[in-house]
Amino acid sequence: MTSCSNTCGSRRAQADTEGGYQQRYGVRSYLHQFYEDCTASIWEYEDDFQIQRSPNRWSSVFWKVGLISGTVFVILGLTVLAVGFLVPPKIEAFGEADFMVVDTHAVKYNGALDTCKLAGAVLFCIGGTSMAGCLLMSVFAKSYSKEEKFLQQKFKERIADIKAHTQPITKAPGPGDTKIPVTLSRVQNVQPLSAT
């Protein structure tokens, strides 16, 4: 507020020193002072309600990340399982009873398919266990610490105290109850006087 009056005062001083006061026509606006007051009053009390981050916030992040990674493992496991079961195996041995030919590439290929089945099952189990554990952790992470409960109670008391001091207007004013606000009790003419 003082910085605004200093700048306004310095502008008037410059206008006076430059050769006289210039007359202004119209309505003066004091909106800049109103908004300065509002923002100052809002930011004065901001520090009162700051709350430190609790360890529960980190556990919340932990279970969410675990749930997402568990979901990824389940999807990856299902994909690898599908590859292991849906890709047809190759024939390893062919021939007659007395003469059998074994294809070593087919044996390795079929071994890789079996490995895919096993890896898919393991990934699916790890992902499912991770998801179940993280869902349980989310349920148990809802319990608040004593400090956080105390801060919440203190915040609620302050809000209740503020509401108790500011009482809303519940009845309409009667015919004799009307009063002019102090700021409007004196009317000051800001229009220039007409010379004619």
Curated annotation (Swiss-Prot):
InterPro entries membership: Neurensin (IPR024883)
UniProt tissue specificity: Expressed predominantly in brain. Also weakly expressed in lung and spleen. In brain, expressed strongly in nerve fibers of the cerebral cortex, anterior cerebral nuclei, hypothalamus, amygdaloid complex, brain stem of the metaencephalon and medulla oblongata, and moderately expressed in soma of neurons of the dentate gyrus of the hippocampus and Purkinje cells of the cerebellum.
One GO BP annotation of this record: nervous system development
Example of a GO cellular component annotation carried by this entry: cytoplasmic vesicle
The entry's keywords: Cell projection, Membrane, Transmembrane, Transmembrane helix
Positions of transmembrane segments: 67-87, 121-141
Induction: By retinoic acid in neuroblastoma Neuro2a cells. Down-regulated following fear conditioning (at protein level).
Topology class, membrane: Multi-pass membrane protein
Cell location: Membrane; Cell projection, Neuron projection
Protein family per UniProt: Belongs to the VMP family.
Described purpose of this protein according to its UniProt entry: May play an important role in neural organelle transport, and in transduction of nerve signals or in nerve growth. May play a role in neurite extension.
The protein's name in its UniProt record: Neurensin-1
Organism the protein comes from: Mus musculus (Mouse)
